[in-house]
Structure formats: structure tokens, C-alpha cells
A protein has these predicted regions:
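Axial heme c-ligation environment in periplasmic c-type cytochrome domains
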Residues: 57-67, 83-116
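The canonical Cys-X-X-Cys-His
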Residues: 37-47, 109-113
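Bacterial N-terminal signal peptides that target proteins for export
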Residues: 2-16, 24
Length: 118
């Protein structure tokens, strides 16, 4: 019984340390970008940026696959698409603008979607 209690405590402490290391290893802006993406983008663009989110199937035109749509695009172009919506960059007006994001959030999100598209 003492061994089982020790094992449970050791496992709990090891798991807590592992989770703490994960959050330290991932830059804060990347964590923020992942959260923003999950809340604002996943429903249309999908978790992996393939344009296959659950709401995306009902949109016309379909949401873009970042691997295709971001190829050759500058960070400024991507930021403008995020803050101004699709029509701000000559793309689908179905994508809404996210003008309330801070500059740091937009930069982090640009990096995040570029990573998804790579």
C-alpha cells in the first residue's frame, strides 16, 4: 500500500513536471496563436489549416488550404487577410475581418498559419 501511494505521488509529480516543461518549451506567443486559431479559425479552416473545418463545408467558396493559398504570400499579405478579411486581399469576402486582434496577436497568428501551411 505504501508502494502504491508512493507510485501515485511520483506519477503525479512527474506528470506535473512534464506539463510544466511543455508550457515553458512552447513560446507564449505560439500558445496564444494556437488558442486564437482554435477559437476563431478552426471552424472554417480546420485544425490543420486544410480548409476542412465543420462550418467550411457549407461555405461557397470553400475555405482555403493554407498549404496552397499561402504559398509565396508575404507576412504582410497574411496579416492583412487576417485583420481585413478575405476581401482586403482580393480573396473571398466570406472570410471576416479580425480587426480587434493586437499587433502581437496578428504576428503570432501569421507565424502559426504559415507553420500549418508548411
Amino acid at each position: 500500500m505504501i508502494v502504491n501511494r508512493f507510485s501515485a505521488q511520483f506519477l503525479s509529480m512527474t506528470l506535473a513536471a512534464f506539463v510544466a516543461v511543455l508550457f515553458v518549451a512552447i513560446p507564449a506567443h505560439a500558445q496564444d496563436a494556437a488558442t486564437i486559431y482554435a477559437q476563431q479559425c478552426t471552424s472554417c479552416h480546420g485544425a490543420k489549416g486544410k480548409g476542412d473545418g465543420p462550418a467550411g463545408q457549407y461555405l461557397n467558396p470553400k475555405p482555403s488550404d493554407f498549404a496552397v493559398s499561402l504559398k509565396g504570400k508575404s507576412d504582410d499579405w497574411i496579416a492583412k487577410a487576417i485583420t481585413g478579411g478575405g476581401s482586403a486581399v482580393g480573396e473571398s469576402p466570406v472570410m471576416p475581418p479580425f480587426a480587434s486582434l493586437t499587433g502581437d496577436q496578428v504576428k503570432a497568428l501569421v507565424d502559426y498559419v504559415k507553420h500549418l501551411g508548411s
